[in-house]
Regions:
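Surface-exposed molecular-recognition determinants
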Residues: 14, 40-205
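Residues in flexible loops and secondary-structure boundaries
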Residues: 5-7, 23-25, 33-35, 61-62, ...
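Short, surface-exposed terminal/edge motifs of secreted or surface/virion proteins that either
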Residues: 17-42
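Beta-strand repeat scaffolds of extracellular/surface proteins
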Residues: 1-4, 30, 79
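Extracellular/surface-exposed low-complexity repeats and stalk/linker segments enriched in Gly/Pro
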Residues: 1-17, 22
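N-terminal cationic amphipathic segment used for targeting or macromolecule association
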Residues: 1-4, 8, 36, 43-44, ...
Length: 205
């Protein structure tokens, strides 16, 4: 904070905080004219909470419940996540009424090092990660961003590299009936068993 801008310099403007009126942001142009930009300036950093890391080494689903109220972004990070089968991995979200298995608006693309690529549109049953063989492991990130709190609408993005030299990109959106409070990482067939890896979760409020 200061009482005034520093000495005028031709062609140079200055941004400063006025100490006579605390938290008032000022701009002084190159001819010395003071312009108030904002008063009661406050900067609030997002609160990031690191959830518990979960081993994806058993069961048919990895469940994360108790998403904090007011959460605006959720990040899942996967390392070496594998199952004993070849069903595509699937991410589902839900609220107090349970998980949602339909109504997603999404698409998916697969790119491999051999030059093969494919895409699938109108995916309505969740976010998918392509699996082509049981040896595939998923490594990457799932990001969920709150689009509209009034309709509990979320935008979702998946980037996952598989150890069989392929990359999955998936994007979707989904509206819930109530606030998001649960996320599940599972498979499309729901019966393949997880046998390796781990998943962590972060919340931003």
């Amino acid at each position: 904070e200061t009482a005034a801008a520093a000495g005028d310099t031709a062609g140079v403007g200055q941004i400063w905080v006025d100490d006579a009126v605390p938290n008032t942001l000022m701009f002084t142009n190159d001819v010395g004219t003071d312009i108030q930009l904002a008063s009661t300036l406050e900067v609030t950093a997002a609160k990031v909470t690191q959830g518990t890391k979960v081993a994806s080494t058993s069961g048919t689903a990895i469940n994360f419940t108790g998403v904090p109220a007011g959460t605006k972004r959720v990040t899942l990070s996967m390392q070496g996540v594998s199952t004993d089968g070849t069903s595509n991995h699937r991410i589902l979200i839900g609220d107090s009424g349970g998980l949602e298995t339909s109504g997603y608006l999404g698409a998916q693309a697969l790119v491999s090092s051999g030059g093969y690529s494919s895409s699938t549109g109108n995916i309505s049953d969740g976010m998918r990660i392509t699996i082509t063989q049981a040896a595939d492991t998923s490594n990457g990130t799932v990001v969920l961003n709150l689009i509209d709190a009034s309709t509990n609408t979320w935008g979702m993005l998946v980037i996952s590299g598989q150890t069989t030299n392929q990359l999955t990109l998936s994007a979707s959106s989904k509206s819930l009936s109530a606030a998001l409070d649960r996320i599940t990482y599972t498979t499309v067939n729901g019966s393949d068993v997880f046998d390796a890896g781990m998943i962590s979760i972060q919340y931003e409020i």
